Amino acid sequence: MRLLFAIALLGAVFAEDAWKAANVDRTIDATSQIVKVSTLYSFENVGNGPQSKVLIALSKEESATLSFISAGIDGSKGKLKISEKPAEKDLAVYEVDLRTPVAKGAKVTIRINLRITQVLEPLPSKIQQSDSQFVVLHTSAYVPSLYETVTQKTTIRTTQGGKLLSATTVSPSKQETERVIYGPYVNIPAFETKPVKVHYENNSPFVIATIVERFIEVSHWGNIAVEEYIELVHKGAELDGPFSRIDYQMDRRGRRQPALQQFTTVLPAQAKDIYYRDEIGNISTSAVRIRADSVDVEIRPRFPLFGGWKTSYVIGYNLPSEEYLYSKGNQYALKTKLFDHVFNDIVVEKLRTKVLLPEHVKRVKVATPYAVDRRPEELKPTYLDTTGRLVLVLEKENIVPDHSQFFTVTYEFEFVDMLREPLLASAFFFSLFFVIIVYSRFDFTISSDPAKDAEERSQIILGNLAKSVDSKQSAYEDLIEASQQYKSTKNDADLQEAKKTFIAARNQENSTLTDKIATLKTDSGASAAEKASELLKYDKTVFDAVDNYLKAVEKSTTKTAGTEEQQFLNKVKDARNRADSVLASI
């Protein structure tokens, strides 16, 4: 074990002795809440042979808050592989794979880009609404290095138009309107640092997303639903004292106030059905701008976000699956982003991305452009599911916009499983309707109730009695109408034919009434049958007056009804009223 450690240590020493930093030019952009560092290294191979790896050093403070790091050959496309190594003398060490070995005596120029978060300290920590925000940046005038540096320079960019209160002097150095320049310094030994502090005005809103929960639901029926829950907090200088809406509106600084007033979220160009809401409901102070390659959602919260204030909201949209879901046979690949561009220079403390896949997927694999934590998979049951859908859970902390990159989820899914839910729904509704039909057509009672059955039959008989009464009433009305026509035509044959038709219809309905009254007597007793018999009695009184009525019609010389005719019409009307009363009393 000791031998292996000694060999590793010896290899590290040889690697450090193999390079010399001929020139280092570092630029620190501290104009926002994210400190963006771009360092151009010119290395010379002073070793005994070709070298394919070089070591980069950061201070432990930078490494502790490092969010993103990338490396590349200056002037060339593509990224170099970079990996973290054990620390040396209070410096964090990263190894860069150059891909192509560098010959002895040759030089290589590489550029290292860093994104460092939450290192700018507000000073003072509390300010009034009308005050500007000042912050302090702690760094080193010398670029941390494991190699001797021949020449180096550091440029710190501060906010445009902002005040520079102070900056540590390390000769040679100079302060300008919007930047501080340290160097050039020559022949700086390895591991040498020189702490400096820059105190300057920075009114960028230091708004942090403490949590971003992104939910991606994949459907093979043509849609991918995306929803994000975001919690924001302003971690800049806290607002000291009350907030005045009037002073806020009249502030001439406008967007240079240290508060988040509005921001633009960039969504994919195919995004549709966009919604944006908070705990209260939909927020109308937002607008959607369609661009050539994106959809911009301009969001204005219900209130500006000052230091110490927080808010949360939900934003969601739909995407066409043909743009992001690829297939070959039963193999599928989902390619989308781990998170969207929330707004410029956003810092996300914790990102949790969940991918809801269709039920019964198999052989799921995830490929990400950078390391993420893959949490245990979950199951989420939805409509018509039997076992629940698989949910992938990916997490990462300390996120910046540079992390908004595509990742890929591959899986297997059979076509028959896609048809299972529609067929299941069809079978369910078919079964439901079949049960309803069977239930409505059959009597499932164990034993019948004689009294209830008799009552039901009685109700049917009463209905038939009412129909017979209506039919006889219609026969009387037809006879009366024929009599009125006779007054105009004096056609005796038509009148006699109408009388015969009336008598036949009356006799048929009376026969029906007699049969129904007999049945009613059996089911409901003699009392009900006796009442029903009155229907025949009232009818007989009217029928006995038919001949006298017709004779009066034949003798009449006017179209108006005479005395005998009117008496007959009154008898018909009275008989119908009595019949209705009898039916109601049974």
Curated annotation (Swiss-Prot):
Topology with respect to the bilayer: Single-pass type I membrane protein
Pfam families: Ribophorin_I
Claim: ATP-binding is one of the keywords in the record: no
Pathways per UniProt: Protein modification; protein glycosylation
Domain of life (superkingdom): Eukaryota
Keywords noted in UniProt: Endoplasmic reticulum, Membrane, Signal, Transmembrane, Transmembrane helix
Phenotype of gene-disrupted mutants: RNAi-mediated knock-down is mostly embryonic lethal. Embryos exhibit cytokinesis defects which lead to arrest during development. Embryogenesis proceeds more slowly and embryos are osmo-sensitive. Defective localization of the yolk receptor rme-2 and impaired yolk secretion. May result in chromosome segregation defects.
GO CC annotations, alphabetized: oligosaccharyltransferase complex
InterPro entries according to UniProt: Ribophorin_I (IPR007676)
Subcellular locations according to the entry: Endoplasmic reticulum membrane; Cytoplasmic granule
Signal sequence segment: 1-15
Bilayer-spanning residue ranges: 422-442
Example GO BP: protein N-linked glycosylation via asparagine
Function (record text): Subunit of the oligosaccharyl transferase (OST) complex that catalyzes the initial transfer of a defined glycan (Glc(3)Man(9)GlcNAc(2) in eukaryotes) from the lipid carrier dolichol-pyrophosphate to an asparagine residue within an Asn-X-Ser/Thr consensus motif in nascent polypeptide chains, the first step in protein N-glycosylation. N-glycosylation occurs cotranslationally and the complex associates with the Sec61 complex at the channel-forming translocon complex that mediates protein translocation across the endoplasmic reticulum (ER). All subunits are required for a maximal enzyme activity.
Quaternary structure and interacting proteins, as annotated: Component of the oligosaccharyltransferase (OST) complex.
PANTHER family: DOLICHYL-DIPHOSPHOOLIGOSACCHARIDE--PROTEIN GLYCOSYLTRANSFERASE SUBUNIT 1, RIBOPHORIN I
Name of the protein: Dolichyl-diphosphooligosaccharide--protein glycosyltransferase subunit 1
Organism listed in the record: Caenorhabditis elegans
Highest classification ranks of the organism: Eukaryota, Metazoa, Ecdysozoa, Nematoda, Chromadorea
Gene designation per UniProt: ribo-1
